[in-house]
């Protein structure tokens, strides 16, 4: 049954194609643009380069943009809002809650910073703020207020609870989970939705298991899942995607290149999940390259299009550093891929 549902979806994709986002009443473009690189993720990005990148995304027909207070410690929301407020056409905006951008002041001291993630290179263009995790009722409401100011819009389409889960928080997960569930974080999001301040909410995370848990606590409309439904990681297809469909929760998929290995040439960068790729992943990727070569399909194109073959997925997000990369991603996204290619991947056990 799942195969039939997948094969009914036409694979001649357009980046500008509008898709219904679950029950939110929103339509998003099949290809969305994430803004983390604009905050100086891994390397500095000038204002001129950031503006050019956003304009290239708009010019490519993209009308769904994702940001977060964390990205550049507020910088990305400023940049995105400045661009979108000048456009005659409304785009869909998602941002996130769970982190507040703040500093010490008279009458307020900040808690100690959590242990630094060794994989986190920091923000080369970040604003001069510190991030403080706060998933409580007041924290969510303040985060929404702050994002309104940075983006310059009185309403925000979607709010994702950012990085809740053990992958980010480790031993402190229960503390933050209790703030979200018992401390009113989900209640705040529900109130914002009921008042029309947002159209929907969900989680923005790197682990599908925490979205599954959250569905037991709140009525999620849409969630952003990074790196956990791809050509190299499909555990969620059986364990989670059917639940999302049953609960009427739309999905946006990010991290389709799994930290770069699926966009790199054969023998190039071999990073998977922010670390050196294990041997079994390299073997699987090389076999994907073999089949892609046989059908004259760029592996990056297959990686981008694969998640959208499942009807639970409404859109994918890309994060790029230049207008040229946006244009290349659009070419990959719109590449014609024959059904025989996907059938070959299935026969080899590379997709289900």
Residues covered by each model-derived region:
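Short, well-ordered coil/turn segments that N-cap beta-strands
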Residues: 26-31, 61-63, 88-91, 153-157, ...
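Short, acidic/polar
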Residues: 44-57, 136-150, 206-213
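Beta/alpha (TIM)-barrel catalytic core signal, keyed to glycine-rich beta->alpha loops juxtaposed to Asp/Glu
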Residues: 13-15, 49, 83, 145, ...
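Short, solvent-exposed loop/helix junctions and linker helices
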Residues: 133-137, 234
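N-terminal binding-site loop/beta-alpha segment at the start of enzyme catalytic domains
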Residues: 2-114
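Charged, glycine/proline-rich intrinsically disordered loops and linkers
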Residues: 104-131
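Short amphipathic alpha-helices and their capping/turn segments at secondary-structure boundaries
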Residues: 14-24, 77-92, 140-155, 238-250
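Structural preference for long, well-ordered alpha-helical segments within the folded cores
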Residues: 56, 64, 146, 150, ...
């Amino acid at each position: 049954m799942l195969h039939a549902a997948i094969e009914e979806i036409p694979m001649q994709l357009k980046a500008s194609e509008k898709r219904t986002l679950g029950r939110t009443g929103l339509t998003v473009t099949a290809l969305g643009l994430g803004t983390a690189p604009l905050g100086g993720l891994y390397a500095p990005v000038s204002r001129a380069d950031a503006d050019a990148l956003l304009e290239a995304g708009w010019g490519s027909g993209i009308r769904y943009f994702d940001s977060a207070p964390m990205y550049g410690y507020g910088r990305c929301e400023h940049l995105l809002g400045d661009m979108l407020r000048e456009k005659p056409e409304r785009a869909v905006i998602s941002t996130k809650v769970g982190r507040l951008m703040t500093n010490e002041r008279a009458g307020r001291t900040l808690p100690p910073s959590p242990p630094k993630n060794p994989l986190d290179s920091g923000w080369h263009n970040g604003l001069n703020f510190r991030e403080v995790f706060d998933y409580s009722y007041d924290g969510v409401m303040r985060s929404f207020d702050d994002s309104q100011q940075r983006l310059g819009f009185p309403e925000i389409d979607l709010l994702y609870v950012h990085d809740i889960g053990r992958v980010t928080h480790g031993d402190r997960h229960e503390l933050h989970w209790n703030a979200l569930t018992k401390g009113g974080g989900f209640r705040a999001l529900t109130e914002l939705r009921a008042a029309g301040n947002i159209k929907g909410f969900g989680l923005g995370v790197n682990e599908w298991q925490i979205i599954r848990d959250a569905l037991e606590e709140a009525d999620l409309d849409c969630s952003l899942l990074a790196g956990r439904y791809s050509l190299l990681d499909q555990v969620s297809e059986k364990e989670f995607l059917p639940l999302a469909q049953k609960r009427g929760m739309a999905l946006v998929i990010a991290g389709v290149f799994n930290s770069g290995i699926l966009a790199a040439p054969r023998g190039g960068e071999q990073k998977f999940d922010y670390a050196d790729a294990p041997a079994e992943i390299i073997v699987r990727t090389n076999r994907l390259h073999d089949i892609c070569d046989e059908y004259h399909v760029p592996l990056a194109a297959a990686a981008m299009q694969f998640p959208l073959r499942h009807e639970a997925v409404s859109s994918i997000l890309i994060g790029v550093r230049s207008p040229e990369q946006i244009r290349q991603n659009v070419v990959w996204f719109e590449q014609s891929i024959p059904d025989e290619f996907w059938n070959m991947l299935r026969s080899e056990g590379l997709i289900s």
